[in-house]
Amino acid sequence: MNKFMLNETSYHGAGAITAVVDEIKARGFAKAFVATDPDLIKFGVAAKVTDLLDAAAIPYAVFSDIKPNPTIENVQNGVAAFKAAEADCIVAIGGGSSMDTAKAIGIIMTNPEFADVRSLEGVAPTKNPCVPIIAVPTTAGTAAEVTINYVITDVEKKRKFVCVDAHDIPVVAVVDPDMMASMPASLTAATGMDALTHAIEGYITKGAWALSDMFHIEAIRIIAASLRGAVANTPEGREGMALGQYVAGMGFSNVGLGVDHSMAHTLSAYYDMPHGKACATLLPAVMAYNAEATGEKYREIARAMGVQGVDSMTQAEYRAAAVEAVRQLAEDVGIVTSLKGVAREEDIHQMSVDAYNDACRPGNPRETSVEDIEALYRSLM
């Protein structure tokens, strides 16, 4: 039996942001807890939402102690702030950092026996839905607005841990490309390649099935057609990426990912490397490694990436073509698929052990060892 979970409601398209107020009123919430990051406040992005709340006379409190790779301390501070605010819903504005922090706060508030967020690692044993979350993404990548996952960094132990919990999915997602227009080109590229990684890993993961495949292959097609334009800040590119990353999230949230994400989590934990950039850096190498365990799926990936003449190619040819198309897209949007100057040789073994133990690794289509992961890291150094 396969299970599929999504938001209760989602809004898409330019101008969708007004739905935040509509949903707060319709659901009878009295006060919002706005979780966002300092840069979104600094550059006026969060104000696009809080101005609407002000105009509608909806009370709210703002919490912005959120790092790009959110930490245990960020979550603890957020829980304390939520209690002080006496709010009854969360409006999460941002990328994966804000969304993940909001999910952790919301879960702990309704499941206080798990006050230590580390106790929620893996498939979390919570019993109660989290505080209702209205998620407003400002990046086109993580799709955290539609997923049942969140990732927190344990700074002391230099590791990220993944929490999987059906109780944390936002009740509402408001996916407005206008909220993403202020992203610089480099962030657009990194988060966009993260979305492509979600789509590709979700398509080939062990848990994939017919419904998830439909979402993932369409997400690959949309992202391949849109990311270059989004990096150039065209409206069509932004709109396409807003949709493509959400469609990818609809899929992978329900079936899992693979070793690319496991290795990326470790890179971020050790070197504070942005998650999207880490995923993108690894993707071509991990795709080449996994090819032998993917049957004919790389034929469809190549086709969705826009490769011509796929039907006449041999298995080796279409697999190579799929990897090359992804590598070329990464290059075109300015992603360097190398770890030179980033990873340190003395860290490789422990990083590989940590990646092997990551919650995403078991879904990888090819059986993977610590030694395999070490070889993948070293191949990029």
Positions of the model-derived regions?
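C-terminal catalytic subdomain
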Residues: 255-321, 327
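C-terminal charged capping/lid subdomain of soluble metabolic enzymes
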Residues: 298, 302, 308-381
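An N-terminal, well-structured beta->alpha segment
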Residues: 1-63
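Carboxylate- and glycine-rich phosphate/diphosphate-binding segment that chelates Mg2+/Mn2+
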Residues: 149-255
